[in-house]
């Protein structure tokens, strides 16, 4: 994360906004401030790169369920509003790095129609060319959304 924040390349060379989500309280305050400044400086594109740190899909679902029960509500659209990711669209694609083929407690509810791409490369070492390859593959997929 430190290396990523130190790079200037992500500020201008990519056609997407960068947003960090999750519990950032474990990070040094200076780093959180840098993250917030980066997010403010990247609001020009419709495309988004959303980086979740210290996020648990299970915790998110449990917290949303507790809120629903407390408010005596049972509706899928309202349930989604109680999730921490409520203002984030469900991901169209997910790149899983490090050679793992599991979700690892990430976005358990939100990935029902997400296309997955896998690489053995660890995230800090994933190259722009690999990401572009996955994006090109993604655009070749006929998405059916459960139909």
What are the roles of these predicted feature ranges?
Residues 1-147:
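Flexible, compositionally biased loop and terminal segments
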């Amino acid at each position: 994360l430190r290396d990523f924040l130190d790079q200037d390349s992500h500020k201008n060379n990519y056609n997407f906004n960068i947003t960090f989500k999750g519990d950032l309280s474990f990070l040094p305050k200076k780093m959180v401030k840098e993250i917030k400044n980066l997010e403010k400086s990247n609001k020009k594109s419709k495309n988004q790169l959303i980086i979740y740190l210290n996020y648990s899909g299970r915790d998110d679902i449990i917290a949303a369920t507790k809120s629903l029960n407390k408010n005596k509500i049972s509706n899928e659209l309202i349930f989604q509003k109680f999730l921490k990711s409520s203002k984030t669209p469900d991901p169209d694609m997910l790149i899983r790095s490090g050679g793992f083929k599991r979700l690892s407690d990430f976005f358990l509810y939100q990935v029902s129609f997400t296309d997955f791409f896998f690489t053995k490369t660890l995230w800090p070492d994933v190259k722009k060319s690999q990401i572009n390859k996955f994006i090109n593959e993604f655009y070749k997929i006929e998405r059916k959304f459960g139909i």
